[in-house]
């Protein structure tokens, strides 16, 4: 069973990659080191909520979607990523 940190991390990575951002770009946008952001994506560290809000704003999605571990959330993440890339 996945931990919440792993679920959030997978969703962060998926959304970032689909949106065309690098880890460095996201980290800079939210004011953390790339290594810290990498730890969030890998599920090693818990993402502070205030940073989740910044990340959700950057990706143009609702923060709660980053906690979802299901197909509906994946579809919403995909839709958000395509809106960003347009």
Model-based region annotation:
Residues 1-18:
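A short, Lys/Arg-rich alpha-helix, primarily the initiator
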Residues 10, 14, 28, 39, ...:
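DNA-binding alpha-helical recognition surfaces that contact promoter or target DNA
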Residues 20-42, 54:
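Short alpha-helical DNA-recognition segment
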Residues 38, 64, 72:
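Nucleotide phosphate-binding site architecture
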